[in-house]
Amino acid sequence: MHQYHDLLERILSDGAEKHDRTGTGTLSVFGHQMRFNLGAGFPLVTTKRLPLKAIVHELLWFLRGDTNIKYLHDHGVTIWDEWADANGDLGPVYGYQWRSWPTPDGGHIDQIANVIDMIKRNPDSRRLIVTAWNPADVEKMALPPCHCLFQFYVVNGKLSCQLYQRSADVFLGVPFNIASYALLTMMVAQVTGLKPGEFVHSFGDVHLYSNHVEQARLQLTRAPRSLPTMTLNPDVKDIFAFRYEDFALAGYDPHPHIKAEVAV
């Protein structure tokens, strides 16, 4: 995972001091790209321990089209608690836009089902896109989408995915995002009869919060270890049929967790 360490180092050396919505302060760079060959191992950061359960359940929650944290709580995941209202609702966030994008005539578009169908029918299409950035709904969301658009690409029987992330908390959020979209790429590849190719992660404002600087410096003193492998249950052929038990991670030997506070 040298790609991630290179990004941390770039921000620490070249980042501009910027004010931000949370009032915490950041070091920020604009425009960066990382590439991960999914055939070389599952890109789960090894220089600190990450909670795979939370990553998997959050992705399954998105794919359900869910926007209430009850499902997450039922599975011991609390990463969205700070933004939910008293009823656990978040407004029309990721899951809603992915699965039920509203149309002017009162209908809804299931972008996930549509893109999978298009990959099967026309894999050379340049329109294999899902977006969560809906300007009409942004003000209704508890948190506007940070990872806001992704595109699939098929060549030589392999499926690749590129994510555009407008805003990225490099210490806490980005390791989650890498693993989540790598896993989504593997899932979509399986249900479309393809092999996983690359995950390409492109950023707009990628930043290190001022209260994460020492943690990032600590992480950079640790040597990355071999990537683990992720295996999916080969019997699952429907993207919406995956369950937590269908994922098996092997060979994950990370350095210890590094505690840091989330900026809300």
Swiss-Prot record:
Pfam families hit by this protein: Thymidylat_synt (PF00303)
Q: In which pathway does it act?
A: Pyrimidine metabolism; dTTP biosynthesis
Superkingdom, natural source: Bacteria
Q: How is this protein organized at the quaternary level?
A: Homodimer.
A biological-process GO annotation:
dTMP biosynthetic process
**From which lineage does this chain's organism come?**
Bacteria, Pseudomonadati, Pseudomonadota, Alphaproteobacteria, Hyphomicrobiales
- InterPro entries hit by this protein: Thymidate_synth/dCMP_Mease, Thymidate_synth/dCMP_Mease_dom, Thymidate_synth/dCMP_Mease_sf, Thymidylate_synthase, Thymidylate_synthase_AS
Positions binding dUMP in this chain are: R21, R126, R127, R166, S167, A168, D169, N177, H207, L208, Y209
| UniProt protein name | Thymidylate synthase
Q: Which residues cross the membrane?
A: none
The catalytic residues are: C146
The coding gene here is: thyA
Sorted UniProt keywords: Cytoplasm, Methyltransferase, Nucleotide biosynthesis, Transferase
Q: Where does this protein hold (6R)-5,10-methylene-5,6,7,8-tetrahydrofolate?
A: D169, A263
Q: What class of enzyme is it?
A: transferase
Organism, by scientific name, is Bradyrhizobium sp. (strain BTAi1 / ATCC BAA-1182)
Q: Where is the major localization of this protein?
A: cytoplasm
Localization recorded for this chain is: Cytoplasm
Family of this protein: Belongs to the thymidylate synthase family. Bacterial-type ThyA subfamily.
- Job description of the protein: Catalyzes the reductive methylation of 2'-deoxyuridine-5'-monophosphate (dUMP) to 2'-deoxythymidine-5'-monophosphate (dTMP) while utilizing 5,10-methylenetetrahydrofolate (mTHF) as the methyl donor and reductant in the reaction, yielding dihydrofolate (DHF) as a by-product. This enzymatic reaction provides an intracellular de novo source of dTMP, an essential precursor for DNA biosynthesis.
Provide one Gene Ontology cellular component: cytosol
Which EC number(s) does UniProt give?
2.1.1.45
Q: Name one GO molecular function term.
A: thymidylate synthase activity
What this protein catalyses is: dUMP + (6R)-5,10-methylene-5,6,7,8-tetrahydrofolate = 7,8-dihydrofolate + dTMP
